[in-house]
């Protein structure tokens, strides 16, 4: 089924003759507008009632997008925004020692540490990672195991935590962070990656489940997390590292599946394989996939023309869902499985994914 979908996608792309949309002023203006809306509305429009800490994983995804876009565009409010949040919180992580979500904001701390070399930015995230490595979680790699969330037993975790350990190895020179990351990433992927489809299950609860159309259940954003994570890790690991080829092969395998699941308008959906039940776009997934595809094209890993076309189409579709004020719609709320979306739904990780995509599109 997977090979058939991919071949059909290649044929459709070859026949469509869709011209590549030039990156330029308009793309930069839209991305700046999205960034500014996120800054102006931070802490509002939450998909779950109540308040949210600055160290929440959803914000961590936004901070990464902000800093990535700032590096490329020079749009200073993005970096100033993340710096201000880090400083007012003393660069602290979330409360849960082992939970991958609660170290996600460490990505922003380390990205800023690489620039400013302020020890205050490094200390809390390093202490957290050192503690996890020194006293590793003693549980199975299974979401339903006792304390199962203490390991990377759900696919989102592969975005939240591994980039932190990879960056720590780079900034400290201690390869122990990378060794820990590799062990846990491999174990998680052995459990959750479906080699036949080239996609990740969200967690073990979805093994054997089927969508209404009979296809396996592969969550759009969940696979977006994983695909973006692979691009980030490949950007962080030295090419000479013995594990680099593993991540490269995983990225290439997923890339084929990702383009096969893109719809005719350029979007991805809440479910990767059931667009009938979920006919609407899902723009956190679309943002992460567009980022990964454009990143792969820019780094020379994705050389077939189909990938550049898919990235351009993904970007065009994303931009069509940005309002005049910079609000990005059709972003699925916090959850762990495919859910229907609408134009009014938005979330910070959608904005973060959009800005990550923009950072590569303008260079493509």
Pin down the residues of each PLM region:
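Bacterial Sec-dependent N-terminal signal peptides
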Residues: 1-24
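Extended ligand-binding groove/face enriched in aromatic
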Residues: 79-83, 91-206, 212-216, 325
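Extended ligand-binding clefts on enzyme/binding-domain cores
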Residues: 155-159, 163-272, 279-290, 302-331, ...
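CBM-like carbohydrate-recognition segments
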Residues: 9-11, 23-60, 67-68, 72-79, ...
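Hydrophobic alpha-helical membrane context
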Residues: 15-17, 71, 235
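Membrane-embedded glycan transfer/ligation machinery
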Residues: 60-63, 106, 159-162, 224-227, ...
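Short amphipathic alpha-helical segments at helix-loop
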Residues: 19, 50, 93, 113, ...
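Charged/polar interaction segments and conserved charged motifs
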Residues: 23, 27-37, 64, 68, ...
């Amino acid at each position: 089924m997977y090979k058939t979908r991919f071949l059909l996608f290649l044929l459709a792309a070859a026949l469509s003759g869709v011209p590549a949309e030039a990156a330029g002023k308009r793309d930069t203006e839209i991305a700046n507008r999205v960034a500014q809306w996120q800054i102006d509305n931070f802490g509002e429009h939450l998909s779950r009632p109540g308040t949210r800490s600055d160290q929440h994983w959803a914000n961590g995804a936004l901070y990464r997008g902000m800093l990535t876009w700032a590096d490329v565009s020079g749009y200073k409010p993005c970096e100033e925004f993340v710096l201000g949040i880090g400083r007012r919180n003393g660069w602290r992580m979330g409360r849960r020692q082992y939970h991958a979500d609660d170290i996600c904001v460490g990505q922003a701390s380390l990205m800023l540490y690489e620039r400013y070399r302020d020890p205050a930015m490094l200390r809390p995230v390093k202490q957290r990672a050192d503690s996890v490595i020194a006293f590793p979680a003693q549980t199975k790699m299974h979401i339903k195991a006792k304390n199962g969330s203490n390991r990377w037993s759900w696919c989102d975790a592969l975005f939240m935590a591994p980039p932190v350990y990879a960056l720590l190895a780079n900034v400290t020179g201690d390869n122990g962070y990378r060794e820990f990351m590799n062990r846990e990433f491999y174990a998680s992927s052995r459990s959750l990656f479906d080699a036949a489809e080239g996609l990740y299950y969200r967690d073990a609860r979805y093994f054997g489940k089927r969508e209404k159309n009979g296809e396996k259940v592969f969550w759009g954003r969940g696979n977006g997390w994983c695909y973006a994570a692979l691009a980030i890790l490949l950007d962080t690991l030295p090419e000479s590292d013995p594990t680099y080829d593993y991540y490269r092969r995983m990225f290439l395998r997923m890339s084929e599946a990702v383009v096969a699941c893109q719809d005719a308008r350029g979007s991805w959906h809440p479910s990767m394989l059931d667009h009938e039940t979920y006919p609407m776009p899902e723009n956190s997934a679309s943002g992460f996939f567009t980022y990964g595809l454009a990143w792969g094209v820019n780094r020379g890993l994705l050389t077939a023309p189909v990938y550049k076309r898919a990235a351009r189409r993904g970007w065009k579709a994303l931009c069509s869902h940005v309002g005049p004020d910079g609000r990005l719609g059709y972003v699925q709320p916090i959850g762990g499985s495919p859910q229907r979306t609408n134009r009014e739904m938005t979330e910070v990780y959608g904005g973060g994914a959009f800005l990550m995509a923009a950072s590569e599109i303008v260079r493509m």
